[in-house]
Amino acid sequence: MQRLLSGSLTICALALALPAAAQVEYPPVPVEKAAYHWPVFSNEHVMVLRVYFPPGRGSNYHIHSLDQISVQVEPGANAGQVWGEEPTPARPGTKGQVSFTAYSKKKFIHKSTNTAATPYQNIVIALLKPKPAGLAPAARPDGYVQVFDNERARGWKLALEPGQSVGPITQSAPGLRVVIDGGEIAEIVSGQPDRGLGLRLGDFYWQEPGTTRGIRNIGTTRIEIAEFELK
């Protein structure tokens, strides 16, 4: 009987210890090493991460230390916790939200978990150069809505209904396009045949400077994209 009681007490002690062991936190990692943060592209200018949290999933503690552009393409609802602080409650994201954060001036350490029944997806563009390279983005015509302009980059959003088009722009600095709502477009370059493109939510494209192009929605659904040029 005494041996049975002793064994039962040991099992209870182990059961109580398991939750504590499960909550052990490892040291923060660089953002590109965090769970559900996948590096998908890099060059001398940028590192692009696809952050994708299925429902109920999230990241471990990680460090943001590079200036960063973010585009939310699937909003989810993330609960977060800053390193050394109390957790913050979940709040729904906003599809299409574009943001810029100067993490090079003050690094940020946190973790987050998607509490929604739908996925969370964020395209993160980390700027690898520590300061501007002296590039100069040009102004864009009506249709492009500027969403930010600072010492590191300039950003716009463009939405087109089926059949709508936007006048040509000449891209004067390197940058990216991120797809918020997919569909079909034609890129129009003078002297060349129109180039049809199928856009998918969360797709991104690196774009070199020097091209003059217009865009027309040739599909049956509204498209929305964000475009950025570096400085």
Regions found by a protein language model. Give the residues of each.
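Glycine- and acidic-residue-biased ligand/ion/polar-headgroup-sensing regions
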Residues: 65-84, 171-191
